[in-house]
Amino acid sequence: MALYAIFRVRGRVDVRKDIEDTLKLLRVHRKNYLSIMPKTESIEGMIQKAKDYITWGEIDEKTLAELLKKRGRISRRKKLTLEYIKEKGFNSFEELAKALIEGKVTLKELGIKPFFRLRPPSKGYGKKGIKKHFNEGGALGYRGEKINDLILRAI
């Protein structure tokens, strides 16, 4: 089962109520928040509704492991540690990332927060900024595998 990485690019000002509600369901409450969601039909419908505020794509194991290692949280103030992962039966962040992508476990089952607070990406979003689609040189919309580059720059 593939996982989508959904990254909120635009802020909270002048967003229609129905789109704001959809963004909350996707767990991207603020700018530069990222959430990990399964690739299902209902999630894809929500993504299409909020496509003018987010960018998304399929996350790979290496990027997911790095994201969990550096930005994973158990609670608001507690970082995700290797000791916590070992308590849950995984030997490394890479093993956990592989299990998540294969669909064997979920973040909720492990008690890990399903969203990540990131920094703005180094070198920016794109030449044309945050108001244009990715295909036009901007930041919004579907990126596919290139979402991994954006995530690594924002960690």
Curated annotation (Swiss-Prot):
| Similarity remark | Belongs to the universal ribosomal protein uL30 family.
Please give the positions of the paired cysteines in each disulfide bond.
none
Natural source organism: Nanoarchaeum equitans (strain Kin4-M)
User: Mind telling me which InterPro entries this protein's record contains?
Assistant: Ribo_uL30_ferredoxin-like_sf, Ribosomal_uL30, Ribosomal_uL30_arc, Ribosomal_uL30_euk_arc, Ribosomal_uL30_ferredoxin-like
This protein's record includes keyword Metal-binding: no
Could you list this entry's UniProt keywords, alphabetically sorted: Ribonucleoprotein, Ribosomal protein
Q: Which Gene3D superfamilies match?
A: 1.10.15.30, Ribosomal protein L30, ferredoxin-like fold domain
Domain of life of the organism encoding this protein: Archaea
Name recorded for this polypeptide? Large ribosomal subunit protein uL30
The protein's GO terms of the molecular function aspect are: RNA binding; structural constituent of ribosome
One Gene Ontology term of the biological-process aspect is: translation
The UniProt entry's GO CC annotations, sorted and at most eight, read: cytosolic large ribosomal subunit
The record's HAMAP family line, in alphabetical order, gives:
Ribosomal_uL30_A (MF_01371_A)
Listed under subunit, the entry gives: Part of the 50S ribosomal subunit.
Classification via CDD domains: Ribosomal_L7_archeal_euk
